UniProtKB/Swiss-Prot annotation:
Disulfide bonds: none annotated. This is Bcl-2/adenovirus E1B 19 kDa-interacting protein 2-like protein. It comes from the Eukaryota. The gene is Bnipl. Residues 1-116 are annotated as: Disordered. Homodimer. Interacts with BCL2, ARHGAP1, MIF and GFER. Residues 92-105 have a biased composition (Acidic residues). Residues 36-45 have a biased composition (Polar residues). Residues 162-323 form the CRAL-TRIO domain. The lineage of its organism: Eukaryota, Metazoa, Chordata, Craniata, Vertebrata. GO terms for biological process: apoptotic process.
Amino acid sequence: MKLGELELREEWQDEEFPRLLPEEPGSPGDPEDPQRGSQAGTPSSLALCGQRPMRKRLSAPEWQLSLTEGTGENGASPTRSASSSSAGSLDLEVDELETPSDSEQLDSGHEFEWEDDLPRAEGLGASEAAERLGRGCVCDVAGEDGHRWRVFRTGQREQRVDMTIIEPYKKVLSHGGYHGDGLNAVILFASCYLPRSSIPNYTYIMEHLFRYMVGTLELLVAENYLLVHLSGGTSRAQVPPLSWIRQCYRTLDRRLRKNLRALVVVHATWYVKAFLALVRPFISSKFTRKIRFLDSLGELAQLISLEQVHIPEVVRQLDRDLHGSKGT
């Protein structure tokens, strides 16, 4: 009885599914049931394996026709070939997913190769280094008013600087080489080159001078940097207003504020120290701890090399007056 039930179930399976196939409409009417009943479980399993073309009507082979190019040329392929082709297509899809990520890593690595050349660019001025290191981030254009304009492009930002109006004050910022290992740039800020507050268009000049300094800093600074403020020879009329300093600090990019290792102030006068005390509430405590005061150029020479540092003559003269020949 059990064998008969098994045979009936096998006959039901053999009779039911082939009816769905249009190419085998006469299979249920064949008078070969006694022969099938005489076969044991092994022939029935073989018969089921032999009827594998009925699975070709499943959606898997047809999907492979639309998703891949190489699996749908023969629509009557057996399920083993369909399953192997689908597995192969899955392997190919995984490779395709990994390939873009590998290429993106290679592309992202090439974006920073130019920074490896920064330490070799020694002895450059601020504007020359910006043009040489910017790699297309800086361009000079002539305006309709006859002024020469410099355009700084950093990321998605664009700053236009009136170079004609700030030409006498460009020396306020200069590049002093590199300190230690790596890309630790030395940036000099000589306040003796700042304009006096009594000149015409003072606000306009200071605004474009600030744009010039920020644009040059973003091009020169690759990693950490040391900012040296040469405050010697600066009159009170040349000290910028508090609002300008506060605007500079707030507008300064976070990367430049974070990568600043130290702010070294040389020959700080009493009003410069008082000015820094007034600015302290507007700056962070971390930035305040980075400020360091030096009394002479000799102390500065112990901190950094002065071979590539451009020191104004008025600062050198002040240092000689204060400390004699041993100061430098």
